[in-house]
Design a protein with these regions (language model features):
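Blade-level signature of beta-propeller repeat domains, shared across WD40, Kelch, NHL, RCC1
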Residues: 447-480
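Ser/Thr-rich, Pro/Gly/Ala-heavy low-complexity intrinsically disordered linkers and tails
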Residues: 21-68
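Beta-propeller blade signature
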Residues: 128-153, 215-239, 288-310, 384-413, ...
Length: 480
């Protein structure tokens, strides 16, 4: 049932996407319209053999654009990370693990990982099926695992398996289904110690509506909720920021993480929670270049954690990063030109699923983990055939694809939050393609969540897609 259900969902989204594209033809340029930013070219790549201990493999240093601040001498680099090995997640997390966070109090104070379960909202009485029946009790689930000593093995089956400390538990109180029952992906989660008058620590969850254009048209929607660590006391759904540009549900929810207090105080007015998403569609297609709707590149929006057990209203937020949408100029079906994109070589297939603020040894960066299209924005609809070896479904194809980790200067992003320059002018300074992944950097399967253990300076990344249709997950570990 699982594979058939997901294929049906993929076919449905392709049909709906085509309908949206036909209805959203941009109007001709008008006087005073913003022009897309010039895209800097990449410089040389430093490729080394996969699996090396320092993990400085397949790195591209991005040529800086206009000076937008930042602190080059304090930028984290892939050479600062040492690969420690990996471990398997229990099969409970097959077709899941899109979200990951480190829980410092778990496993008797040794720290554990909280991991999202099946990627769709579902009813345990109907495992592996999307929530198409209105009578089903569907929700978002997560579990807790101990962190075993990571190991290296040629076959991922030989890796140690994490022990399940807490079984998959619903933690959204049926709230996510109020956004949409079928078009939702359960994306990420973040642990936040109790604040203000709260009586318990909190677990924040986030979602994306994977075809928001079909579900909401040009309207925005909420993407975040919170609950107690045991899943009770859920409140939401919350909209990130006010219902005005540049805030929009299409820019939120794919990843969720916290930043250090010192950084929040210096740049973000004390706000510590960050979310974002890459969804390259405009709100309505009436402008040649716009900040309304999605973003043609990853986004970062920081918001304030709640201080009460029963919060209401929109969450107080600031933009740190987003890119303008030039449609169809940048990534229109079969006609888009990357020269019109703010983000270098953006494609409509780009998906970023994990994020973390990583720091140590006097260096720091915000890292995003994702699956990047490297080809043209081909839209497979007769008579066009994109000949994508990863999928023969209708819709966008941007093969080949690769997993990337992109590094952003935290000071440049902080200066954006202070209003010192436009969010779309900040680019990643390094692109890293870890070769430790079992499927390699170039694969049809996307990545999963990312988390950072600040005390022990460990970075965790989820690799999905093992055993093909089983979509098993492995967690890779680096130290700093």
């Amino acid at each position: 049932m699982l594979r058939r259900d997901l294929l049906a969902l993929a076919r449905l989204v392709a049909v709906l996407t085509m309908a949206c594209l036909l209805a959203c033809r941009p109007a001709p340029p008008t006087n005073g319209a913003e022009q897309a930013a010039e895209v800097p070219a990449d410089t040389t790549a430093n490729d080394t053999a996969g699996g090396d201990e320092e993990s400085h493999n397949a790195v591209t240093e991005v040529t800086p654009g206009p000076d937008v601040g930042g602190t080059p001498g304090e930028r984290l680099q892939p050479t600062d990370l040492t690969y420690e090995g990996a471990f398997r997640l229990p099969e409970d997390f097959n077709w899941g693990a899109r979200g990951l966070c480190f829980y410092p109090n778990g496993a008797g104070g040794n720290g554990s990982l909280l991991v999202t379960g099946f990627e769709l909202l579902f009813d345990p009485a109907h495992p592996g099926e999307s929530c198409y029946d209105p009578n089903w009790d569907c929700g978002a689930y997560c579990g807790e695992v101990a962190i075993p000593a990571p190991a290296r093995a040629a076959d991922w089956h030989d890796l140690p398996e994490a022990t399940l400390l807490r079984p998959l538990t619903q933690f959204d109180g049926d709230l996510a289904a109020t956004v949409h029952r079928e078009y939702v992906h359960v994306e990420d989660l973040a642990y936040v110690p109790r604040r203000g008058s709260q009586t318990q620590d909190k677990l924040y969850g986030s979602l994306v509506v994977w075809y928001a254009e079909g579900a909401f048209g040009e309207d925005t929607f909420p993407t975040v909720w919170l609950a107690n660590l045991d899943g009770t006391g859920a409140h939401g759904m919350f909209h990130i920021g006010p219902h005005e540009t540049p805030f929009h549900g299409r820019k939120m929810g794919a990843y969720l993480f916290t930043v250090p207090t010192w950084y929040a105080d210096q740049y973000l007015g004390g706000r510590t929670l960050v979310t974002g998403r890459c969804r390259g569609t405009p709100a309505d297609g009436t402008e040649p270049v716009t900040t309304r709707g999605g973003s043609q590149g990853p986004t970062l929006f920081v918001f304030r954690a709640c201080d009460t057990d029963d919060p209401t209203g929109d969450l107080d937020a600031l933009p740190m990063l987003y890119y303008r949408v030039s449609f169809p100029g940048c990534a229109g079906p079969n006609v888009g030109d990357p020269a019109n994109c703010d983000y270098p070589d953006f494609t409509m297939c780009d998906e970023w699923t994990g994020g973390a603020f990583v720091e140590g040894t006097g260096r720091r960066a915000i890292l995003l983990l994702g699956h990047k299209g490297l080809g043209n924005n081909c839209y497979d609809e007769p008579p066009v055939n994109c000949h994508d070896p990863c999928s023969d479904d209708h819709g966008y194809h941007c093969q080949p694809y690769e997993r990337q980790v992109i590094f952003y200067d935290v000071d440049a992003l902080g200066q954006t939050a202070l209003g010192q320059h436009n969010p779309w002018t900040v680019l990643p300074y390094t692109i890293w393609r870890p070769t430790e992944f079992y499927l390699g950097p170039t694969t049809c399967w996307n990545a999963g969540g990312m988390a950072f253990d600040r005390e022990n300076r460990r970075l965790f990344m989820v690799e999905r897609g093992l055993d093909d249709d089983t979509n098993a997950a492995v967690v890779h570990v680096w130290s700093l």
